[in-house]
Amino acid sequence: MSIIVKKLSKRYLSADGTETVVFEDFSAEFQDGKVTAVLGPSGVGKSTLLNCIGRLTSFGGEIVGAGEVAYVFQDDRLIPHKTVYGNIEFTLPEASKEEKASRIKSVLETVEMTDKASAFPEELSGGQKKRVSLARAFAANKDVILLDEPFSSLDLALKSRISADFTTMLEREPKTVIFVTHDVDEALTLADEILVLNDGRISFKISVEEPRKGRDITGKHINEVRKKLYEAILV
């Protein structure tokens, strides 16, 4: 379903009583079944926006349509005392044993982590943890997935690999996805729509018309979009 943010306000109070306004009267709409990337300089409220949509922080205004969401954090947040299988199973409390087994098998096969089902997080590499986090989010079977800097700690080869896993899972089960990133090429690879945040507002918005599967981010259209994005971010 579409997510509609209406007149969002969010402020933080520092220890010395100084108030920081992150959002004031902010509105946006995230289209049903689309992948939206949120770009912008550090400190403009990208992660705060996700936290508001995911109900992880208090806020003023209204957010319609988010419902229950799956969240992929920058630091993965796998449960250390549970195996890979257990971490994914944890998101399926109401499913039958057979349903859990089937769903977990499916997502682990997609990210090629079946052989790590009984491993604990401390036994996994950074890339493997990220793949488990994505698998867990899709296994939860929520309509909305939020991702905060999902690939920031990975090298280029791993980014490419995990981005491909992400695209494959979305082809099988379309979701409304919002992800925060500093990486313009990552946004161009994965997103249907890209927003640029500046000073608590959307300063630029553009659609990427080419299908995600097989998208050539070196092509003429994408290069034109890239140029506009850099201009918007560097304002």
Would you name each region that the model predicts?
Residues I3, V22-D25:
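Conserved structural motif at the start of ABC-family nucleotide-binding domains
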Residues L13-D16, S58, G86-A101, T110:
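ABC-type ATPase nucleotide-binding domains, specifically the catalytic core motifs of the NBD
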Residues L39-P41:
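The feature captures the beta-strand-to-loop junction immediately N-terminal to the Walker
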Residues G54:
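Helix-to-loop junction immediately C-terminal to a conserved catalytic motif
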Residues F120-L124, Q128:
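Conserved ABC ATPase signature
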Residues L134:
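Hydrophobic anchor residue at the start of the ABC signature
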Residues A139-D143:
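A short, proline-enriched helix->beta-strand linker immediately N-terminal to the Walker B motif
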